[in-house]
Structure formats: structure tokens, C-alpha cells
Design a protein with these regions (language model features):
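Core catalytic region of metal-dependent phosphoesterases/phosphodiesterases
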Residues: 6, 12-102
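Extreme N-terminal starter segment of soluble prokaryotic enzymes
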Residues: 1-4
Length: 102
């Protein structure tokens, strides 16, 4: 597993395009990009979020994020909980996960 860390995407996932993040061509779903706060991909809590979330889910890696102060906590709480590497997550998409606190 490879781990890459970034933060403050605020719903703008252009940094994960292949031309910006060329290392992804050798990554798999076992590799993780961790967004450390202010993910912003679940902002509206409806279909307006789909394009960005579907883009991330289509990448060859898994995106995990920790919520920040700019999140829609009510919308995030509506996603199902699961266990991932011994911790609780919210499954936003099969390969887009919110790491639960606590």
C-alpha cells in the first residue's frame, strides 16, 4: 500500500487528474489518497455532488478523508457505516471513504 496525503480540496478534485497526479498510473485500489480535512465532496447532499464523487471513484486508488470544518455533516451522516482496516468509515462510494472520528 502506498499512502499520499493532501488536504483542503473543497470539492475541487482537479489535482487528481492524471496530468496533475501522474503517479496514479501505477496505483491500485489498495493505495490510498488521504484528504486531511475540508474534503467538500459531499456538500449538497444530492445529485449535484455526483460528478466529483464519481470521478474519484473512477480513479485507480482509494480516496479516504477526514472531515474538516467545511463539510455538510448532516449529508455525511446519511451514508452507511462500515469497517475499514479496523476503524469505522462512511462509505460515500466504493472507493471514497470518510474516516469516522473517535
Amino acid at each position: 500500500m502506498e499512502l499520499y496525503i493532501t488536504g483542503d480540496t473543497h470539492g475541487d478534485f482537479s489535482r487528481f487528474r492524471p496530468e496533475s497526479f501522474y503517479e496514479q498510473e501505477r496505483l491500485t485500489k489498495e493505495d490510498v489518497i488521504l484528504v486531511a480535512g475540508d474534503f467538500g465532496g459531499v456538500w449538497y447532499g444530492d445529485s449535484r455532488d455526483d460528478a466529483g464523487l464519481n470521478f474519484l471513484d473512477s480513479r485507480p486508488f482509494t480516496t479516504a478523508f477526514v472531515s474538516g470544518n467545511h463539510e455538510n455533516y448532516d449529508a455525511l451522516a446519511a451514508y452507511p457505516q462500515a469497517e475499514w482496516y479496523g476503524g469505522r468509515v462512511r462509505t460515500i462510494r466504493p472507493s471514497v471513504l470518510m474516516l469516522e472520528r473517535g
